[in-house]
Amino acid sequence: MKPVTLSTLNRYKQEKKKFATITAYDASFARLFANEGIPAMLIGDSLGMTLQGHDSTLPVTVEQIAYHTRCVRAGAPNAFLIADMPFMSYSTPEQACLNAAILMQAGANMVKIEGGSWLIPTVKMLTERAVPVCIHLGLTPQSVNVFGGYKVQGREEAAAEQLKQDAMALEAAGAQLAVLECVPVSVAKTITGSLNIPVIGIGAGNVTDGQILVMHDLLGLTPNAPKFSKNFLQEAGSLPEAVRLYVQQVEQKLFPQEQHSFN
């Protein structure tokens, strides 16, 4: 695989080429994902649930994300790596810069932060200091205690409009990628069409520029897997074939389908 950059992902959006991304936490799986055509990987704070066994992402630390970023970079030297900034690691712009530096030095190409327009000063400060930023809107797992659980966001007209306004404001502040999680397909379509930056969806239908799944969901390892996930290993005969099938179905708009989406 040739080195994947932000320019690569931007070109995919311009060419309307759907692309598949995935969470990764170690060198072996990262190598497998890269070999099967995954251009970008997220070192997600989801590791708090998938690897550590917690019931939320809140206990994850910056040091843990940095450790797993180094592991993934070793296995996928040419992939575009997005590192999650954990809970309360970016509560001020200054704190965000210090913690983002740790993740970038560990091998990340970009950091991801969850939230709305309150993040504008943080996005500006990070991008002014050469740290590319991915924003995460909709269901933001670090806010699970505020939401009262993992619930679909943006179903009401006012909430949907707020998501769109937040996304546009954060793009204007310098964000270069967006993740939309658990929002109605109509909302995802509007936001994706309103932004110039690539939008990656999870539980947002097949109208976004790219898709992402937690690797454990894709491989059928998650008990009570979320509606938006699919066990690709069930249809495939091996791990590489499962990943290849995921990539193909995303590129051909065969995944996600209506049963994986919200209205």
Curated annotation (Swiss-Prot):
Active-site annotation: E181
Pathway(s): Cofactor biosynthesis; (R)-pantothenate biosynthesis; (R)-pantoate from 3-methyl-2-oxobutanoate: step 1/2
GO molecular-function term, one example from the UniProt record: magnesium ion binding
Keyword tRNA processing in record: no
Principal location listed in the UniProt entry: cytoplasm
Residues that hold Mg(2+) according to the record: D45, D84, E114
Cellular compartment(s): Cytoplasm
Catalytic function, reaction form: 3-methyl-2-oxobutanoate + (6R)-5,10-methylene-5,6,7,8-tetrahydrofolate + H2O = 2-dehydropantoate + (6S)-5,6,7,8-tetrahydrofolate
Annotated GO CC locations: cytoplasm
EC code: 2.1.2.11
GO BP terms, alphabetized: pantothenate biosynthetic process
Manner of cofactor binding, per the entry note: Binds 1 Mg(2+) ion per subunit.
InterPro entries per record: Pantoate_hydroxy_MeTrfase (IPR003700), Pyrv/PenolPyrv_kinase-like_dom (IPR015813), Pyrv_kinase-like_dom_sf (IPR040442)
Subunit structure: Homodecamer; pentamer of dimers.
Functional description taken from the UniProt entry: Catalyzes the reversible reaction in which hydroxymethyl group from 5,10-methylenetetrahydrofolate is transferred onto alpha-ketoisovalerate to form ketopantoate.
Name of protein: 3-methyl-2-oxobutanoate hydroxymethyltransferase
